[in-house]
């Protein structure tokens, strides 16, 4: 078992079958009705929650009954999991799942928490890769027998160090989950605040003027400038990230070789895909000075007396998204051209109040962006730690806990 290089002298290499046992208990008399599926991202979760319906048969007696803390291995390929996914039952006391998966539990003399991180970090992938030949799949499943599975080689420290490693990585998980929850809380706060500010339910005391109902067409102007200047920054608009470069989003340019007919979009302009606006694909260009978009996009700018950041938040709100279907009702493809956009009603305060509202909501976005940056840093720290701790390249005495 010498393929594990630079292994600390106190560590040893064992077969998975030496420290764990297969779980084969059946769901007799259909006792348990909690049908599970393995999600690469979410782990072992209720099938109805994952698919919004139960896809298993009514007779579950042949399903495997899994207890909390036990593991499942899904041999099928999924994005980011080329050699299958190991997941542990954490969210329920018990559940049943398809006999197609391999189930196992660790012996009492090892730390299951340690091995959860071990598998999450892909430490078993090299072993699985060596066992299965490239392309040796049966209906998308890796050609990995039960015997081969339990013959996988595992590197591990003694029990005390296993527990310390699991404790350290759990601290990072706690910090990550806390940050995720905080981000979600901030998003919900912004959503509620946005709804109240944009409907004048909450107002700043210095503003007393009545809001006026008007049409967007009174304040917008379409821009159709073509790419005669050979601009090469090709952009797309997404509902999640707003403006992105095509290379960044698609990992390649999907534009045609000749972009002379592409539309120019400048900082402060809006753009949207008429056939994707129903899912929120409309954005304000803030990160780049100038770029180009496919001719299918509509590009427009705000005229005076309409703050573009105020309009950005208005487009994000339920006031716009909730009423959008009625403007799409006559369109077979749920498409919104610019002439239809101009007919949409909007209630507006004066320009200074618009700017104040935009300032407050921008501050909310800044907080969320900082938390997202913190989250990404925590995830990178955890990934780096896992790779070093689980190989014995870094020992637990040198690790500071997550802040």
Locations of regions flagged by a protein language model:
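Non-catalytic DNA-recognition/assembly elements of restriction-modification systems
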Residues: 1-27, 159, 204-227, 343
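Sequence-specific dsDNA recognition surfaces
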Residues: 17-28, 32-33, 39-72, 217-267, ...
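Amphipathic alpha-helical segments
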Residues: 7-12, 115, 150-187, 191-192, ...
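A short beta-sheet element
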Residues: 61-124, 137, 248, 260-320, ...
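Acidic, low-complexity, intrinsically disordered peripheral segments
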Residues: 388-403
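A short glycine-rich beta-alpha junction/loop motif
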Residues: 2, 9, 94-100, 133-160, ...
């Amino acid at each position: 078992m010498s393929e594990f290089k630079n292994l600390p002298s106190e560590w040893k290499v064992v077969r998975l079958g030496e420290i764990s046992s297969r779980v084969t208990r059946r769901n007799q008399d259909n006792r348990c009705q909690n049908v599970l599926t393995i999600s690469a991202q979410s782990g072992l979760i209720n099938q109805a929650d994952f698919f919004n319906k139960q896809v298993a048969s009514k007779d579950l007696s042949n399903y495997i009954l899994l207890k909390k803390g036990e593991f499942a291995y899904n041999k099928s390929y999924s994005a980011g999991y080329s050699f299958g996914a190991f997941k542990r039952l954490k969210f329920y006391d018990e559940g049943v799942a398809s006999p197609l998966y391999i189930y196992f539990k660790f012996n009492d003399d090892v730390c299951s928490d340690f091995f959860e991180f071990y598998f999450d970090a892909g430490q078993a992938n090299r072993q699985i890769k060596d066992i299965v030949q490239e392309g040796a799949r049966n209906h998308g499943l890796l050609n990995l027998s039960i015997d081969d599975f339990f013959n996988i080689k595992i590197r591990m420290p003694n029990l005390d160090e296993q527990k310390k490693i699991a404790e350290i990585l759990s601290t990072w998980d706690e910090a990550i989950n806390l940050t995720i929850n905080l981000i979600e809380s901030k998003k919900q706060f912004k959503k509620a605040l946005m709804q109240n500010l944009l409907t004048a339910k909450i107002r700043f005391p210095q503003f007393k003027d009545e809001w006026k109902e008007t049409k967007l067409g009174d304040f917008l102007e379409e821009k159709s400038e073509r790419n005669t200047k050979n601009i090469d920054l090709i952009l797309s608009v997404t509902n999640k990230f707003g403006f992105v470069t095509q290379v960044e989003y698609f990992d390649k340019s999907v534009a045609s070789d000749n972009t002379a007919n592409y539309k120019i979009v400048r900082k402060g302009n809006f753009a949207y895909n008429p056939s994707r606006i129903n899912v929120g694909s409309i954005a304000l260009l803030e990160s780049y000075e100038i770029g180009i978009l496919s001719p299918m996009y509509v590009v427009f700018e705000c005229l005076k007396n309409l703050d573009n950041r105020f309009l950005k938040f208005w487009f994000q709100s339920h006031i716009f998204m909730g009423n959008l279907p009625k403007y799409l009702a006559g369109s077979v493809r749920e498409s919104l051209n610019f002439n239809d956009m101009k007919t949409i009603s909007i209630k507006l305060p004066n320009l200074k109040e618009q700017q104040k509202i935009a300032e407050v909501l921008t501050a909310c976005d800044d907080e969320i962006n900082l938390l997202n940056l913190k989250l990404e840093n925590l995830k990178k720290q955890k990934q780096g730690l896992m790779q070093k701790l689980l190989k014995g390249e870094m020992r637990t005495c040198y690790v500071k806990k997550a802040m």
